[in-house]
A protein has these predicted regions:
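Tandem CBS (Cystathionine beta-synthase) repeat/Bateman regulatory domains
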Residues: 1-243
């Protein structure tokens, strides 16, 4: 399978002097997580949310100048290898000058299966970021920044009751909410798709692909939350075990 078969051609650009809050609005209205920034830069929704207390600053202050390209004729597995080795979640598709599209880790996860002899417990993050429902969103964002993650699992009395993502927090910012006065349960997702430690990794991949989600909590019936598998974890496993 070639990159051109799974890439998105919905690549939107924004001026470098646009405000961070305006870039958040563009992402949410177009249901995307990345924007090209004129002048050879790219910015992600994580970059924008991490700057929650600087919303009137220009996008260029948080954008990345390191644009990574892949040829549209390259195999999809090659794009996964590049993303994993470079620690990025997307690649521009093109010749290094002209942008034809973008391919993301989520596109790859939807396209490539992983060996069924691998269990969720084999690759899960055994120390996922957690929070409680009455924490402020500002507190959660700062924890996310410390752990360089896009999600926090919301727990109560040992049970998983929700997930809060940078996209959820972006919605709060777009609604002009003060994150210091806004609680997690006002914007968290309560529809939680979770897996068991002994579920196959392929089953978890299918959960991600089917439900278009970026993280799956791993829940043991006796112990409760024991880990999580995010897109970056899954991508690394695909690189080694795809078929």
């Amino acid at each position: 399978m070639k990159v051109k078969e799974i890439m998105s051609t919905n690549v939107i650009s924004i001026a470098p002097y646009a405000k961070i809050i305006d870039a958040i609005g563009v992402m949410l209205s177009n249901n995307i997580r990345r924007l090209l920034v004129e002048g050879g830069m790219i910015v992600t929704i994580r970059d924008l949310v991490y700057a929650w207390d600087k919303l009137n600053n220009s996008v260029s202050t948080v954008a990345t100048r390191n644009l990574l390209f892949i040829d549209p004729e390259a195999d999809v597995i090659e794009s996964a290898k590049v993303m994993t080795s470079k620690g990025v979640g997307s690649l521009l598709v093109g010749d290094g000058i002209k942008v034809l599209g973008i391919v993301t880790e989520r596109d790859v996860i939807k396209a490539l299966r992983v060996g069924k002899d691998i269990m969720a417990k084999d690759i899960m993050n055994a120390d996922p970021l957690t929070c409680v429902k009455d924490e402020s969103l500002s507190e959660v964002v700062e924890l996310m920044k410390e752990r360089w993650t896009r999600h926090a699992i919301v727990v109560e009395d040992g049970s998983v009751i929700g997930i809060i993502s940078v996209r959820d927090i972006a919605r709060a910012l777009a609604a002009k909410r003060d994150l210091r006065k806004t609680k997690v349960d006002e914007f968290m997702s309560v529809k939680v798709i979770y897996a068991r430690p002994d579920d196959t990794l392929e089953k978890v991949r299918e959960m991600m692909a089917t439900n278009n989600i970026g993280v799956v909590p791993i829940v043991d019936p006796a112990k409760g939350l024991v880990g999580s598998i995010g897109e970056r974890d899954m991508l690394a496993a695909i690189v080694v075990n795809s078929f």
